[in-house]
Amino acid sequence: MKKTKFFLLGLAALAMTACNKDNEAEPVTEGNATISVVLKTSNPNRAFGEDESKVAKLTVMVYNGEQQEAIKSAENATKVEDIKCSAGQRTLVVMANTGEMKLAGKTLAEVKALTTELTAENQEAAGLIMTAEPVEVTLVAGNNYYGYDGSQGGNQISQDTPLEIKRVHARMAFTEIKVQMSPSYVNKYNFAPENIYALVAKKESNLFGASLANSDDAYLTGSLTNFNGAYSPANYTHVDWLGRDYTEPSNNAPQGFYVLESTYAQNAGLRPTILCVKGKLTKHDGTPLSSEEMTAAFNAGWIVADNNPTTYYPVLVNFNSNNYTYDNGYTPKNKIERNHKYDIKLTITGPGTNNPENPITESAHLNVQCTVAEWVLVGQNATW
């Protein structure tokens, strides 16, 4: 019996020693804490609907160094409250509309390295993914509040300045397409639009960073045709959801697509983002071109074949060209930026091109006017 008691006492002593060693190895915290985070989101764009700004799922992660200390989500909310964590220096990472993305247990470096791809679901505008850059905070024991008005008491962080999350996507759209042939063509040609395409669109972008554009050279197109032009990507996939039948665009019914951030760098295989309208070149009265007229138009590079009057009017979005003008003194950047709207007014002044993925000549028969804003609107005017 005594041997048994001594044996149990020995086990208890060993257990206490082990516990003490474990406690010594753990980081010392100032006490238990909670953090509540409230968001500031961009105003919705009425033309595309409330879905552009909808936060279907909001996720907040708390990091102690590289390690995830807490993660909590809320459905259909712009705040996540009472996230249980520990006091001390911490990093907050906030994301919205992450869908089935697995975030639990990821290190801070792993989260910062996350990417996303352009999908058909993005084009419905519902639940566009949003992120905020990681922010460092000092949490105290008790209740902490980020972005609140101060009435809650506790430790107020960034009082009255909620954390702002921004859409990862941008939107490019025609808000007007009009045919206004120049004197040289007004009595010869007209144009009958049939389709609108995102002709060249980046497939992937980062989710965090000063720029979300990455060096991945994969692109998507809504067109079935391979053009092999100077702007044609080497890595190119057709998806039918980046093309649609023509509907006359307006400010209240823009016609376009959601796209990802991208940068143009020809030598690196990175291409401009192109929005394009496709249709038929016709006689000035809308009747079909004659065989002779089609042959002449084909030889001029305006239509795709001497028996096919299909023509294209491409617009390189947020691009510098003498054919493009921008509203409000905006300077084009030759790239797509997250959380921007690129609203494009296209004026067609003559025949189009049979290769919309080649550079546009300064004498092209198009004018582009673009308005840029964050959820910023960029107004671009294009004249062909």
From Swiss-Prot:
GO molecular function: structural molecule activity
Keywords: Cell adhesion, Cell outer membrane, Fimbrium, Lipoprotein, Membrane, Palmitate, Signal, Virulence
GO biological process: cell adhesion
Pfam families associated with the record: FimA4_C, P_gingi_FimA
Lipidation feature positions (S-diacylglycerol cysteine): C19
Prodomain residues: 19-46
Main location: other
Site feature Cleavage, where: R46, A47
Localization, UniProt: Fimbrium; Cell outer membrane
Residues covered by region (Important for oligomerization and fimbrium assembly): 375-384
Gene Ontology cellular component annotations, sorted alphabetically: cell outer membrane; pilus
InterPro entries xref list: FimA_C, FimA_N, Fimbrillin
Post-translational modifications reported in the UniProt record: Synthesized as palmitoylated lipoprotein precursor. Efficient export to the outer membrane and integration into fimbriae requires lipidation and subsequent proteolytic removal of the lipidated propeptide.
Signal peptide: 1-18
Protein function: Structural subunit of the major fimbriae. These long, filamentous pili are attached to the cell surface; they mediate biofilm formation, adhesion onto host cells and onto other bacteria that are part of the oral microbiome. They play an important role in the invasion of periodontal tissues. Fimbriae and their constituents are major virulence factors. FimA proteins from different strains have highly divergent sequences, and this has been used for classification. The sequence-based classification correlates with pathogenicity.
Misc. comment: The name (major fimbrium subunit) does not indicate the abundance of the protein, but is derived from the greater length of the major fimbriae. In strain ATCC 33277 and strain 381, major fimbriae are 300 - 1600 nM in length and about 5 nm in diameter. In contrast, minor fimbriae are only about 80 - 120 nm long. This length difference is observed only in a small number of strains, including strain ATCC 33277 and strain 381, and is due to a loss of function mutation in FimB, a protein that restricts fimbrial length in other strains.
Assembly and oligomerization: Fimbriae are composed of a major, structural subunit (FimA) and the minor components FimC, FimD and FimE. Head-to-tail oligomerization of FimA molecules mediates assembly of the fimbrium stalk, while the minor components probably form the fimbrium tip. Linear, head-to-tail oligomerization of FimA is mediated by a conformation change, facilitating the insertion of a C-terminal beta-strand into a groove in the N-terminal domain of the following subunit.
Family: Belongs to the bacteroidetes fimbrillin superfamily. FimA/Mfa1 family.
Protein name, UniProt field: Major fimbrium subunit FimA type-2
Naturally occurring in which organism (per UniProt): Porphyromonas gingivalis (Bacteroides gingivalis)
Gene: fimA
